[in-house]
């Protein structure tokens, strides 16, 4: 993401002009734009025209509109963002108050104005504009006949390809059908890797599976690379890391990211940090349950006692339509930081973020037990807020 201009007043009102450059930047933008903001961007509008003979036709024109945002729709796999609202600035083609939907596009700038820029949103802009926060991990999660090729960016896990091939069982004395199907499966996975993984960007490619599937696949991959003199694969051989996963489904990626070998190799990535923080929370919940709580009310009480060591919070909570509720989460984050606690904002598009959402989206590891919280522990599991 490129920051073109930033003009925010002392009362935190103001506007920023940004240019999304990567598909992931559309996800950041989705987290920046909120109902009630004003958005100015270039868009296509269908307009009616009348010729000198009186015949009416229509054509599409590119114009710049400023909308008061009413609805936001994000397609995570296509990384497309549509913003619907009413026009609030005079325009040659669109009346004041008329509805329009702007589809924000990569490499086309937009200006976003807010009455209140909070700390969470401003921090996201900083992160989005930092070139170090780029996609740096790829993963092939597989079992016989099923594979998911994923990109793990700092903000989301993107499934780039799914490969499914029916593998017949081995029969006594006749394995040819099984072997042919397996080779066809491996070949499709290799093609998907070459099509979807940018080797000049990724630091590491995880190959995760149960049993010996990953070893057999990697043997096939590099035998074929030698046979076909595939320099791209051979030069990047050191980036491939084999780890265990219980299945070829996307959710098994979390197991791969938890592997100590992977964790040390990816220690500087946000995704690995999220996985470790959630893992630490579950361990604390199991071994010292009076120092691990989830649910907003419980966590707020722990914060009042200045007991929070690590706050785990889902980014989807900052997209809440109700301004007061959204502000409540922002205040919690600011307060934990002021009290020297660590704040981990989880992406709801990561496997770890999905798990945190099942725990109400907010959890905390405490520095020390808070007696009144321990007495109410039973309430947290039913708490939704």
Curated annotation (Swiss-Prot):
Presence of the UniProt keyword Cell cycle in the record: yes
The UniProt record lists the keyword Ribosomal protein: no
Superkingdom of source: Eukaryota
Pfam families for the chain? eRF1_1, eRF1_2, eRF1_3
What are its GO cellular component terms? cytoplasm; cytosolic ribosome; Dom34-Hbs1 complex
Record key words, sorted: Cell cycle, Cell division, Cytoplasm, Isopeptide bond, Metal-binding, Phosphoprotein, Translation regulation, Ubl conjugation
Tissue-by-tissue expression: Ubiquitously expressed.
Location relative to the cell: Cytoplasm
InterPro entries tied to this protein: eFR1_2_sf, eRF1_1_Pelota, eRF1_2, eRF1_3, Pelota/DOM34_N, Ribosomal_eL30-like_sf, Transl-rel_pelota
A biological process term (GO) from this entry? inner cell mass cell proliferation
Q: Which cofactor does it need?
A: a divalent metal cation
Q: Name one GO molecular function term.
A: metal ion binding
Positions bearing Phosphoserine: 374, 380-382
Quaternary structure?
Component of the Pelota-HBS1L complex, also named Dom34-Hbs1 complex, composed of PELO and HBS1L. Interacts with PINK1. Interacts with ABCE1. Interacts with CNOT4.
Which family is this protein grouped under? Belongs to the eukaryotic release factor 1 family. Pelota subfamily.
The role this protein plays is: Component of the Pelota-HBS1L complex, a complex that recognizes stalled ribosomes and triggers the No-Go Decay (NGD) pathway. In the Pelota-HBS1L complex, PELO recognizes ribosomes stalled at the 3' end of an mRNA and engages stalled ribosomes by destabilizing mRNA in the mRNA channel. Following mRNA extraction from stalled ribosomes by the SKI complex, the Pelota-HBS1L complex promotes recruitment of ABCE1, which drives the disassembly of stalled ribosomes, followed by degradation of damaged mRNAs as part of the NGD pathway.
This protein's name: Protein pelota homolog
- What organism is the protein native to? Homo sapiens
Report which gene this protein is encoded by: PELO
């Amino acid at each position: 993401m490129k920051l073109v201009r930033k003009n925010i007043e002392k009362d935190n009102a103001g506007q920023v002009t940004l240019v999304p450059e990567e598909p992931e930047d559309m996800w950041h933008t989705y987290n920046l734009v909120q109902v009630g903001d004003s958005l100015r961007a270039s868009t296509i509008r269908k307009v009616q025209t009348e010729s000198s003979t009186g015949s009416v036709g229509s054509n599409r024109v590119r114009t710049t509109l400023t909308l008061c945002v009413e609805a936001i729709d994000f397609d995570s796999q296509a990384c497309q963002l549509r913003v619907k609202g009413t026009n609030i600035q005079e325009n040659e083609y669109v009346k004041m108050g008329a509805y329009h939907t702007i589809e924000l596009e990569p490499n086309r700038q937009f200006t976003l104005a807010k009455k209140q820029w909070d700390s969470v949103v401003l921090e996201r802009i900083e992160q989005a504009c930092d070139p170090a926060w780029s996609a740096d991990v790829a993963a092939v999660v597989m079992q016989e006949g099923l594979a998911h090729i994923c990109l793990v960016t700092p903000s989301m896990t993107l499934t780039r390809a799914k490969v499914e091939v029916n593998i017949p069982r081995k029969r006594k004395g006749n394995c040819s059908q099984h072997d042919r199907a397996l080779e066809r499966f491996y070949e499709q996975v290799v093609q998907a890797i070459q099509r979807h993984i940018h080797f000049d960007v990724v630091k590491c490619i995880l190959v995760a599976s149960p049993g010996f599937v990953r070893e057999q696949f990697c043997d096939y991959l590099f035998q074929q690379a030698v046979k076909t003199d595939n320099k791209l694969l051979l030069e990047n051989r050191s980036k491939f890391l084999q780890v265990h996963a219980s299945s070829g489904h996307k959710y098994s990626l979390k197991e791969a990211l938890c592997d100590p070998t992977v964790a040390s190799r990816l220690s500087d990535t946000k995704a690995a940090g999220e996985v470790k923080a959630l893992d630490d929370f579950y361990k604390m919940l199991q071994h010292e349950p009076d120092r691990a709580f989830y649910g907003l009310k419980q966590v707020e009480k722990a914060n009042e006692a200045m007991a929070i060591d690590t706050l785990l919070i889902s980014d989807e909570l900052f997209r809440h339509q109700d301004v007061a509720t959204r502000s409540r989460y922002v205040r919690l984050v600011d307060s934990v930081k002021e009290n020297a606690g660590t704040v981990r904002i989880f992406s709801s598009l990561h496997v770890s973020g999905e798990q945190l959402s099942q725990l109400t989206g907010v959890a905390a590891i405490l520095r020390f037990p808070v007696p009144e919280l321990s007495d109410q522990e039973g309430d947290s599991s039913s708490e939704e807020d």
